[in-house]
Amino acid sequence: MRPIRAQLAMLWLAGACSHGAPAARGPALAVRTEITEAETAEKARRHDLARVHYQRAIAAARDPDSIAFARHEYAETLVTWGEAPEARAQLEIAAAANPGDASVWHDLGILRHDAGDDPGAIQALGHAEQLAPNDARPRTALAALYWRRGDKANAAREYRGMLELELPERLRAKVEWALAELAKP
C-alpha cells in the first residue's frame, strides 16, 4: 500500500466511524434494506453481490436523503476496494443531493486531495467545517493539508481552532505539538 493510500485509509476510517446526525426524514426503507444487504454481502467478502445491492439502493433512491445515503455508503465501500475515482463521483452526487451533510463533504475533501485537487479539497473540507464546527475531523484534515502545502499560517489557524473544541487529551497534545512545530522558523 502506498503511503498516501495508508493515510487516506486512516482518514477515511476516522470519518466513516462518526457520521453526523441523521436527517429528519432519513432514507427510504427500500434503500436502507438494500444497503443492509450490501453490508452483509461485504462482510462475507461477496464484493460482487455487495456491488449489486449498492447499485439497487442507488436505483431505488428517489428523494435527496435516500440519494445521499445510498451514494455515500457506496462511496465508503468503493474506497476500500481501491476505486477512489468512482467513490469521489458518488460523493459529488451525494453532496449535491444533501448539501448539508458534513460527513459527505469531509469524505469528498479527502478524496479530492487524493486525486490532486487541493483547491477542491480545501473547499469541501471548509464546507464540512462550517456545517459541523464542533467536529475536529474537518479541521484536522484542513490543517494537515495546509501544512503539506507549506501554508503554515492557515495550518496554525486550524489547529488553534481545534484547541477551542472538546478534544481527547491525546489529540490535544498532538495539536499543541503541531502548533509548536509550525511556530519554528
Predicted segments, located by residue:
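Terminal, low-structured helical/coil segments at or just beyond the last alpha-helical repeat
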Residues: A21-A23, A153-P185
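Structural marker of alpha-solenoid helical repeat scaffolds
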Residues: A60-D63, A97, L131, L165
